[in-house]
Amino acid sequence: MLSEVLEMLAVRPDGIYVDCTFGRGGHSRAILERLGPEGRLLAIDRDLEAVAAAGATGLSADARFGIEHGRFSDVGRFVGARGWTGRVDGILMDLGVSSPQLDNARRGFSFLRAGPLDMRMDPTQKTTAAEWLAEVSERELARVLRDYGEERFAGRIARAVVEERRRRPIVTTTDLVRLIEAAIPFKDKFKHPATRTFQAIRIAVNDELGQLQQGLNEAVEVLAAGGRLVVISFHSLEDRIVKRFMRDEARGREMAGGIFETRSCPRLAVLGKPLKAGDDEIRINPRARSALLRAAEKRAA
């Protein structure tokens, strides 16, 4: 959704922008192409392989560009260290797992590739998916599968995991896929039986939804008046958080101590309806089929 991202960011030649999910640099390169000599772009990624890719592609040699290894919750710290708080003209968050992560068997994200059951977006993080599965309780696992994967057979799969790990460790993607296939009584001919479970475990291991919520809050704090927040989500759990956040900020509501409080001045204005990838992009990249882009603009105080 590159053209949609650029349209909603409305990149100015002298603006300051933050790409919170560098990946392999596609969005960052396009933003840099629209920046003049005074423009600045900060990229962030929690994956060290993505950070290394910035050097390999030559982007790190551009004086207008900088990259940091970190998470969404680090946005405020990185922006503040550059003296940009309240001056950022646009922030992009492209959620979920990246294509390079999915396609690399040793990262353990894909149920279609045999590899270690890792799933860490940040390889420096301590707990792998295999280690998490070895320790999580049956009740908590069922909750994660139900809440993060919307898996109708969450209880069956959780019970099967606990029974299997009593016999032997679950350490590879193949181990987990076989277990799931055996636990599910009915197969969906349009979806692999492991899809929801792999999504749920990945979200839990990486605290994706918690990081998203923190990142959205950080983003609004550092944006300039008129600055834009653009978020691409890939499943309903992510989109629900983004939609609710933008809606509540546009209404002047915020969560404090589990209770919504009303501000006198809303901080955001929602920019139109959510956008979807076009047919041409979906033909080139089928994973874009589920992408949904939402954008909002920060109001003047």
Swiss-Prot record:
Q: Which GO terms describe its molecular function?
A: rRNA (cytosine-N4-)-methyltransferase activity
Q: Which InterPro entries does UniProt cross-reference here?
A: RsmH, SAM-dep_MeTrfase_MraW_recog, SAM-dependent_MTases_sf
Q: Which residues bind S-adenosyl-L-methionine?
A: 25-27, 45, 72, 94, 101
A Pfam family reported for this protein in Swiss-Prot or TrEMBL: Methyltransf_5
Keyword Ribonucleoprotein in annotation: no
GO CC, sorted alphabetically, is: cytoplasm
Similarity-based family: Belongs to the methyltransferase superfamily. RsmH family.
What is this protein called in UniProt? Ribosomal RNA small subunit methyltransferase H
